[in-house]
């Protein structure tokens, strides 16, 4: 029988953290990556996930992780403080250009039209990476499984000449945290290569966070050496989690020491200090 004093003090203290085996990095060619995973997943609710995101974790489906790579710290968790955010000229033009898009917020759900757009996006933007061959089941596991407060947002162009007909332009998955919105994944019409739908989506999320009185929009990881991640550095001010502390980040000056040294100064939530 377990003595009462041996019970976890909180659900967060019941989590365990382990490091995965090395695997090829999906962001930087020739690099080897590892992840630190929080388990068991059924204990990670919205409150706990908020604390994990503050510590640099993200999720893919019900899999909650953060980079834990030997000798590399290219992945920097970043967030936008919405009240301090000031759009630049290009972002203001993008916002004005797409203001006619109609956004519909819904619970996570499968839609064949969404999946078709996802496959078009993967084939155009990430051909050969594996995700361009995702089955419907893989798509659902990746984007539509969540144990926290998550939403699906679809953006459509309405055609007034066609009696309410519309064209799906973008789909975005968002987590609602205690201190902000977390952008999980976004895919959009790849045929308009200069439409800047991804930028518009972040601007939309910033406005939503303001309306909900939430202070941050979490953008996942920024990787200086990855051209696909470069757009995140265009949002100012941008805060990064460096040496275990959130601070305003200057992407041109960011000095990123090896991950092992950084993690030693970045305690896990709930007082955890190591990886099993």
UniProtKB/Swiss-Prot annotation:
It holds the Pfam family ATE_N. It comes from the Bacteria. The keyword rRNA processing does not apply. It catalyses: N-terminal L-glutamyl-[protein] + L-leucyl-tRNA(Leu) = N-terminal L-leucyl-L-glutamyl-[protein] + tRNA(Leu) + H(+); N-terminal L-aspartyl-[protein] + L-leucyl-tRNA(Leu) = N-terminal L-leucyl-L-aspartyl-[protein] + tRNA(Leu) + H(+). GO terms for cellular component: cytoplasm. Its EC number is 2.3.2.29. The keyword Cytoplasm applies. One of its GO terms (biological process) is ubiquitin-dependent protein catabolic process via the N-end rule pathway. SUPFAM superfamilies: Acyl-CoA N-acyltransferases (Nat). Keywords: Acyltransferase, Cytoplasm, Transferase. It is found in: Cytoplasm. Its main location: cytoplasm. GO terms for molecular function: arginyl-tRNA--protein transferase activity; leucyl-tRNA--protein transferase activity. Functions in the N-end rule pathway of protein degradation where it conjugates Leu from its aminoacyl-tRNA to the N-termini of proteins containing an N-terminal aspartate or glutamate. Belongs to the R-transferase family. Bpt subfamily. PANTHER family: ARGININE-TRNA-PROTEIN TRANSFERASE 1 (PTHR21367), ARGINYL-TRNA--PROTEIN TRANSFERASE 1 (PTHR21367:SF1). NCBIfam families: PRK01305.1-1 (NF002341), PRK01305.1-3 (NF002342), PRK01305.2-3 (NF002346). This is Aspartate/glutamate leucyltransferase. It comes from Burkholderia mallei (strain ATCC 23344).
């Amino acid at each position: 029988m377990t003595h009462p004093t041996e019970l976890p003090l909180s659900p967060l203290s019941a989590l365990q953290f382990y490091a995965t085996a090395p695997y090829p990095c999906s962001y930087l060619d020739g690099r080897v990556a590892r992840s630190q995973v929080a388990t068991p997943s059924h204990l990670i609710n919205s409150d706990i996930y908020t604390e994990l995101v503050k510590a640099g974790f993200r999720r893919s489906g019900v899999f909650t992780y953060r980079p834990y790579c030997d000798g590399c710290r290219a992945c920097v968790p970043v967030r936008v403080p919405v009240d301090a955010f000031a759009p630049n000229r290009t972002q203001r033009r993008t916002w004005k250009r797409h203001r006619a898009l109609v956004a519909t917020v819904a619970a996570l759900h499968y839609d064949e039209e969404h999946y078709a757009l996802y496959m078009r996006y993967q084939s155009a933007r990430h051909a050969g990476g594996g995700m361009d061959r995702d089955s419907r089941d893989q798509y659902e596991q990746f984007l539509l499984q969540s144990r926290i407060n998550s939403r699906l947002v679809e953006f459509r162009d309405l055609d007034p000449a066609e009696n309410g007909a519309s064209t799906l332009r973008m789909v975005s998955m968002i987590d609602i945290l205690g201190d902000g919105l977390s952008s999980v994944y976004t895919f959009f019409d790849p045929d308009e290569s200069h439409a800047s739908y991804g930028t518009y989506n972040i601007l939309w999320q910033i406005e939503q966070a303001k309306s909900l009185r939430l202070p941050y929009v979490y953008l996942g990881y920024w990787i200086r050496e990855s051209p696909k991640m470069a757009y995140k550095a265009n949002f100012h001010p941008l805060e990064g989690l460096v040496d275990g502390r959130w601070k305003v980040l200057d992407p041109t000056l960011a000095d990123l020491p090896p991950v092992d040294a950084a993690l030693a100064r970045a305690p896990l939530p709930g007082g955890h200090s190591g990886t099993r």
